[in-house]
Amino acid sequence: MGLKYFSHLPEELRQKIVHDHLQQERKKEFLEKAIEDSCRRHVSLLKSDPSPSELYALSKFLDSLADYVGKQFNTRCLIKWKKDVPANIKFEVMEEQHLRLYGFVDMDDLLCREVLPPEEDDDITYEDGMIVNCSELDKLFEALGIKVVYITVSKNCICTPLNKDIVIS
């Protein structure tokens, strides 16, 4: 609604609109702080040797966060794993994603742990039952006209595209 029309509205309606807007802003701010705190808690798992239950919790958190971010941007949101994240952590989380989506179908490919050549120096993501290089996937999505955003997970931080200020390190 344009400001020119807003000023002609009755006082009660203007106050309600302002109140609703401020309430939405507070809710958004609260969610961003909750996401920031959760990211901070989960980033500590990337530096240690997490237990299977901690890896499961990390996987569920990242999946939920990706769903939320995808809804906020009205597009696909994937988890980009930087090369500095220990292989045992990122592959375990991707295995968990695969199990949730497909069960044990094609699990042999993911369990081999040698999906990508060791000399590959690229960030990876799990998409549609496959572990793929992000650069190759970006080229494919661009050619198809599909917009995608990433939650970037590195050894020291989890970065979301929600707010560029939310970089937890």
UniProtKB/Swiss-Prot annotation:
The keyword Repeat is annotated on this UniProt entry: no
UniProt region (Binding to host SKP1 protein), positions on chain: 9-22
Keyword Phosphoprotein among UniProt keywords: no
Domain of life, per lineage: Viruses
Alphabetical UniProt keywords: Host-virus interaction
Motif position, LXCXE motif, interaction with host RBR: 110-114
Self-association state and partner proteins as the record states: Interacts with host SKP1. Interacts (via LXCXE domain) with host retinoblastoma-related protein 1 (RBR1). Interacts (via LXCXE domain) with retinoblastoma-related proteins (RBR).
Purpose: Interacts with and disrupts the function of host retinoblastoma-related proteins RBR, which are key regulators of the cell cycle. Induces transcriptional activation of E2F-regulated S-phase and G2/M-phase-specific genes. Inactivation of the ability of RBR to arrest the cell cycle leads to the stimulation of viral DNA replication.
Family of the protein in this entry: Belongs to the nanovirus Clink protein family.
Stated name of the protein: Cell cycle link protein
Organism, scientific name: Faba bean necrotic yellows virus (isolate Syrian SV292-88) (FBNYV)
